Amino acid sequence: MSDTPKIVCKNIWKIFGTYPQRTLENLDHSLSRAEVQAQTGHVIGVKNVSFEIKKGETFVVMGLSGSGKSTLVRCISRLIDPTAGEMIIDGEDIMHYNDAQLTELRRYRMSMVFQHFGLFPHRKVIDNISFGLEIRGVSKKERRSKAMEVLEMVGLHGWADHYPRELSGGMQQRVGLARAMAVDPEILIFDEPFSALDPLIRREMQDELLKIQAEVQKTMIFITHDFLEAIKMGDHIAIMKDGEVVQIGTPEEIVANPIDDYVREFTEDVPRYKVLLSLIHI
């Protein structure tokens, strides 16, 4: 992990509604999110969020349902346009990017892995994995070679010519991970990728991703609602509530010094040995 920031998020706001900019300009900052919605009919998805993500680190965004974590991460890729703020990647504010620049960013530098695998049922595993390379115009021989390489990396040797329906849920998620890795992105974004899996398979996938990250050292953003998963996966964790980041720190910092009762509720039942184990990366 480098000390150089890969992503810098500065004062990001996302307000949903008919007049988001006007609502932000006239906002009474003393009001809660529920009060803002009641008075204006607008919903604050992300509220004045700032942080840095270093090159090669795994940054976890953690919070309960409705906390704003998925909205925030979609702002990072500009799948959702923020209402205000700066989103700086490699020194460039992508808020100023046009459609062509955003397409290039998502096609060449950034990949996403979702909870629902999104595999093409009519395409074999190898063709699902190589899809991003196909979109880029990479030759069939080259994309098959790269797809086979990442297939091996995620532990699916021998499954190249099978269809998704022939795979278990855990195996399908491995294909989703391989598809994201195949395009060799600088940034990988995971939106609760393992939450639909059985607990045992979920732990296996967490371990697999930690193993891969130790090898490839990508910049990873990982969303979860599970605090144990957060402390296992993250170099740093941002905990969200009602659209705000309430605390950022390493797993051990957050467990040792929760900033308020909301964070303390996540940490109080976590045995110390769990934190220590989470820091032993594969």
Language-model-detected regions and their locations in the chain:
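Conserved ABC ATPase "signature" region
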Residues: N26-E35, E92-D93, S130, E134-G137, ...
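Helix-to-loop junction immediately C-terminal to a conserved catalytic motif
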Residues: S77
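Conserved ABC transporter NBD signature motif
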Residues: G85-D93
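Conserved ABC ATPase signature
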Residues: Y163-L167, M171
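A short, proline-enriched helix->beta-strand linker immediately N-terminal to the Walker B motif
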Residues: A182-E186
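ABC ATPase "signature
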Residues: I248-G249, N257
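Conserved small/polar residues in nucleotide/adenosyl-binding loops
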Residues: I280-I282
